[in-house]
């Protein structure tokens, strides 16, 4: 099990943030990046050849930029939700919906006037792409996420204004991309994997709702709903290689969950989000033995 004191320090640090959700999100993002950088062993990758879709034109301080939105059946699809459900999710929590995509390397090209420009290939799941073709909302959402992803990955500042290229599905040539081949299954709910301690009375601590998902192939994130709590005071958390145990103050909550993945407990971090009344846990995963 991980050292409860170490995790308790993380809870206290987030507690001081209070209701400032923006700073909390920044803290969680920073923790996630640190965890991903700590992983030195990466799963093997496989090459895919994305298929052309459509091309948009924008610019940066360096000049013209083209983004080729491509697709491949090898890219995992996002969660299957309606546009109404998606809109509600985005209004409640902008980080609650994820569209898996592969961001390709920049490649130099020449535009129609023979002037130099830069192009990027962004690939999404093929079935999702076909659905996106019939939805302006999904298309604009994908373009926004792709643009922000390229900005983060390559330290760019792209103009949010863009124009779709007519009669030109891509700029230049679409290169092969490497994606991780050892994709672990996306985990949404682990309620049926929950294993309560034997002999616990029905009137005992409540089992909180647990939601987990893979933020990256080597990073597992968890949200534990704790509506009866206003802060992290009295919370205890222990993490083993494949187990998460949480206790609440005054025995309000108790969670003992088996997780069928190998967790790096020493690098795990936790924070309590006061506004959402959730315990957020970021857990890097140990490499799968070859």
Curated annotation (Swiss-Prot):
Signal peptide: none annotated. Pfam families: PIH1 (PF08190), PIH1_CS (PF18201). Expressed at low levels in normal mammary epithelial cells (at protein level). Highest expression in lung, leukocyte and placenta. Expressed at lower levels in brain, prostate, colon, heart, small intestine, liver, ovary, pancreas, skeletal muscle, spleen, testis and thymus. GO terms for cellular component: cytoplasm; nucleolus; nucleus; pre-snoRNP complex; R2TP complex; ribonucleoprotein complex; RPAP3/R2TP/prefoldin-like complex. It is found in: Nucleus. The modification Phosphoserine is found at residues 12, 173. GO terms for molecular function: ATPase binding; histone binding; histone reader activity; phosphoprotein binding; protein kinase binding. One of its GO terms (biological process) is chromatin remodeling. Its main location: nucleus. Keywords: Nucleus, Phosphoprotein, Transcription, Transcription regulation. The record marks 57, 64, 113 as: Interacts with TELO2. Component of the R2TP complex composed at least of RUVBL1, RUVBL2, RPAP3 and PIHD1. Component of the PAQosome complex which is responsible for the biogenesis of several protein complexes and which consists of R2TP complex members RUVBL1, RUVBL2, RPAP3 and PIH1D1, URI complex members PFDN2, PFDN6, PDRG1, UXT and URI1 as well as ASDURF, POLR2E and DNAAF10/WDR92. Interacts with phosphorylated TELO2 and mediates interaction of TELO2 with the R2TP complex. Interacts with phosphorylated ECD, EFTUD2/SNRP116, RPB1 and UBR5 and with RPB1 in a phosphorylation-independent manner. Belongs to the PIH1 family. Involved in the assembly of C/D box small nucleolar ribonucleoprotein (snoRNP) particles. Recruits the SWI/SNF complex to the core promoter of rRNA genes and enhances pre-rRNA transcription. Mediates interaction of TELO2 with the R2TP complex which is necessary for the stability of MTOR and SMG1. Positively regulates the assembly and activity of the mTORC1 complex. The N-terminal region is required for binding to phosphorylated substrates while the C-terminal region binds to the other R2TP complex components. This is PIH1 domain-containing protein 1. The lineage of its organism: Eukaryota, Metazoa, Chordata, Craniata, Vertebrata.
């Amino acid at each position: 099990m991980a050292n409860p004191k170490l995790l308790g320090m993380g809870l206290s640090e987030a507690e001081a943030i209070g209701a400032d959700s923006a700073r909390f999100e920044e803290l969680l993002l920073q923790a996630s990046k640190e965890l991903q950088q700590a992983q030195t062993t990466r799963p093997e990758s496989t090459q895919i050849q994305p298929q052309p879709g459509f091309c948009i034109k924008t610019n940066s301080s360096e000049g013209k930029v083209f983004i080729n939105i491509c697709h491949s059946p090898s890219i995992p699809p996002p969660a299957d939700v309606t546009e109404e459900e998606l809109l509600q999710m985005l209004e409640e929590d902008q980080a609650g919906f994820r569209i898996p995509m592969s961001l390709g390397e920049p490649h130099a090209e020449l535009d129609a006037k023979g002037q130099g420009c830069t192009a990027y290939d962004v690939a999404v799941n093929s079935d999702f792409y076909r659905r996106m073709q019939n939805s302006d909302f999904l298309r604009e959402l994908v373009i926004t996420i792709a643009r922000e992803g390229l900005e983060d990955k390559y330290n760019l500042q792209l103009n949010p204004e863009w124009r779709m290229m007519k009669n030109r599905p891509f700029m230049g040539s679409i290169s092969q991309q490497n994606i991780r081949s050892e994709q672990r299954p996306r985990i949404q709910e682990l309620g049926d994997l929950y294993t309560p301690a034997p002999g616990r009375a029905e009137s005992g601590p409540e089992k909180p709702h647990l939601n987990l998902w893979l933020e990256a192939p080597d990073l597992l994130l968890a949200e534990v709903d704790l509506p009866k709590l206003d802060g992290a005071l009295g919370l205890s958390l222990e993490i083993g290689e494949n187990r998460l145990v949480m206790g609440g103050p005054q025995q309000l909550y108790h969670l003992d969950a088996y997780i069928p993945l190998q967790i790096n407990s020493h690098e795990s971090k936790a924070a309590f989000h006061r506004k959402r009344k959730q315990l957020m846990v970021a857990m890097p995963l140990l490499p799968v033995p070859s």
